[in-house]
Amino acid sequence: MQTDFYEDRLRVFLEEFKKNTVAYSEKIEGFLYKPCEYKVGNELPVVDESFKSFEKNDRWGGKYDAHAWFYKKLIVPKELTGKNLELTVSTQLDGWDAVNPQFIAYVDGKLQQGLDVNHREIFLDNAKDEYDIFLYAYSGRNDCLLDFNVTLNAYYENARRLYYKIAVPYEVTLYHEPYEKVYVDIENYVVGAINLIDMRVPGSKEFLDSVDTAEAYLDREFYGKYCKKEDVNAVCIGHTHIDVAWLWTLAQTREKVLRSFSTVLELMKKYPEYKFMSSQAQLYKFLKEESPELYAEVKEMVRLGRWEVEGAMWVEADCNLSSGESLVRQILYGKSFFKNEFGVDSKVLWLPDVFGYSAALPQILRKSGVDKFVTSKIGWSETDKMPYDTFFWKGIDGTDIFTYFMTAQDKVRGKKPATNVTYNAKLNPCQLIGGYDRYQQKDINNEVMITFGYGDGGGGPIRKDLEYYDVLKKGVSGVPCAKMEFAGSFLERIKKRAEKNPKTPCWQGELYLEYHRGTYTSMAQNKKLNRRSEFLYENAEMLSVTAQKLLGKEYPREALHDGWETILLNQFHDIIPGSSIKEVYEVSHRQYEKICEAGKRIKNDAETAVAENINTRGGVLVFNPNSFEASGETKLDGKTVYVKNIPPKGYKVVTDVCNTNSVKVTDKFLENRFFKIKLDKTGAFSSLFDKKNKREVLKKGERGNVLTAYEDIPRDYDNWEISNYYTDKSWEVDSVVSIKPLSDGVRAGIEITRRFLSSTIVQRIWLYENTPKIDFENDIDWKESHILLKTAFPTEINADKATYDIQFGTVERPTHKNTSWDAAKFEVCAHKFADLSEYGYGVSLLNDCKYGYDIHDSVIRLTLIKCGNYPNPDADECRHEFTYSLFPHSGDFREAGTVKLAYLLNSPLEAKKIESQNGTLPEEYSLLSIDSENVICETVKNAEDGDGVIVRLYECCNSRANVNLTLGFDFDDVYLTDLLENEERKLQKHGRTVNLTLKPFEIVTLKLK
């Protein structure tokens, strides 16, 4: 019982003693106030009649995202001049820091620091007689009226210092059992110290002298003699995770950066050992644009070795949805910015809060000069716990990368560590002990990394963190010894340790987050714009190179770069996943509209320049943006036609254009030379017979292309989540309004209009004269909420795994639920296609903008719409236009050509009529060609340094390839480069041809000069 009394005694003592550290406190009134909009620049407003007196009972705010200025000429009492003072600001709203009222404090005209629920003090060290105080206030995501309270405080420095020296060891005992020796020992020393403190008259000479005596006792007996540094270290680095957008817009993110970074800089002045790390080049660019002066201060702290610039990427991007080339550009743009602005070569991919990690990443990282990967989000998996926290992660091509999972969490006495961890830790005994307890690789490493500080506008580390560090760095028994160190140097040390230790484990394949599966589908329009923009800008680059090489046309470097920056920005892990507020998507949509207009202009300018210079007798000019010779459908004068043998990354003037079809269509069946489809009364497939392969595609007794609506009310994180019980309640979308036949050039089909509640689903199903695929064009006016809409194809395929398209390759995933790990993958991410094949036959389901798949028990499902209502109450209640294609085939997806068909769906042939004309260019041209079926050229662009052309290839079938790459232009030299375009070695060439050997799923980048 006495031990319990000890804990209670210390708790109430510290509460009382903390009050007695205050030497002076006075409420400050008489502020002037002026509502405003978002400020532009750092010019302070003129204090004129537009400012009104803010009286004692006044309130401010009253709406979301309200802004205001507060001003006060502060007169410091004479007895306080020369002392260290603090001006404390509060709003009486103490909720979550990310959405609370926040301020930027300007002292004597200079932006000094941010203020928020965690950082309430404006530091006035060596106080002057008077100050001009401006506070730029932001109400947060609150529509309530807010208080505004300011006090001027002074403290007894020795008492405040002693407070922390007592509080830290006291907190250590809270995470040990009362019968442990360390608990008993600390109790004796701490009680001995507090018994020396005379609190009869706080502030008296007796009080202050007793404080000095107690501090000397602790320093001598406890910290000096008893405490020994533990063998376990907690490497600590200040951090503030700032979401580029989420529950706020990009405009507010700019302010969050100003507040957070200025607060860090201000605390650095007070705590010389304080080190801080921040990622995301985009945030630094925001800072540079908003406050060049503050940006210069950050650069100086980087130079002095106190501020760590790391992270590699432009933003902390979603790694499920971003394309392979986008991930390359994330790192290329991010690392280039850090190198050019700070002289830093970033070596760490820092993604603490991203919703899963593609198995293509290890190779992308390694070939970008990034050799370490850090996250913590994987600890949020709701079913299984990753067995490792320090390991080598092996990707689809066999490349491995050193990986470290952060493990900070609260320690709970008497309980085993929880699964969830945090990247917004507190530098206190609770989380240092909890972080090491949670860490699983103690047999190879005795250190953990703690990133401490409030995120998302919470302002980063607080004074308490840094005061605790001053105590914990001494080495307090019962808690890991705190050590301030950059993340990069810590990770490099642990990596070397792991490389030497044979016990270091390896994880092969994707790091699948068993959570947030709805992010593959939510906010479908945003995902569609991302997919369109990715292909548009790659094609615009390639065509610009074509026009440059053929005609000497200037390459639009700046416009292309700006467009890519916007694409990368919108791949932030709360924008593209669909988990932000409505206003974020309104801004994002405008940004996409702008860059799509610019990208189309660049592409069209290049195509037009080429077209105007072709020497031809006339016909149809067809451009093929893909890296393989293509025959397929395209639009000509609004009609679907079929063209043959269009050269890769090139064009051809053709005269043989097919524009008719022999497809048979009724309301009961569709038939061409490839398939015979029987329809039931709802328009679903009751049979799909593959005439070429003489087999039924659908499982006996089952129906294909059945649209099903599932109740989607996840247990939390509405727009993020799909909970596994969603299948318990569903409704078939079978209310048919009409079925009518369609004919369009080389294709024919039916249009089915269905109703579901208040929504209208129009689906056009097409069969083709020359291509063995079935297209489903969808035009949906969606009005529902909390519904998950899927299409399903139950196939007659026997396979225990399915193949999914990802960045620069594919992954296989189980179709069964044998283990909890298998069952947890009830919804997975893929890019352009997924395939289910048995030996000799299979079915691919392609798409032009969808990402969520579900293939189990031979049923292929594609998720079409998810419409939660938090944080966006109107999410996906809009028009949806998209296409998916069913491709039954002989062989597997490799033999069938699924990869090429998927590229053609997303990057189709383009045709236009061309009249007879004279010109300098031939009627047929290929910028490059590859003599291998399993190698794709993803990118052709000018080099970032302007010196040459970059060509990026990858092997797409998990097979080795010896290929000849033939270019359509002259070049003197060819170099193998990394993904950052650094030359690694010179290659031999034979005329315009380069011979290459690619390993399975290997990415190869060349520079031609």
Protein language model features and the residues they cover:
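N-terminal catalytic cores of secreted or lumenal carbohydrate-active enzymes
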Residues: 2-14, 18-21, 75-78, 88-321, ...
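Surface-exposed loop and adjacent secondary-structure segments within mature catalytic domains
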Residues: 296-306, 325, 358-417
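Histidine-centered catalytic/metal-binding microenvironments
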Residues: 1-40, 151-248, 533-646, 940
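Short beta-strands within extracellular/lumenal beta-sheet-rich domains
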Residues: 63-79
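Catalytic grooves of carbohydrate-active enzymes
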Residues: 179-198, 202, 241, 245-247, ...
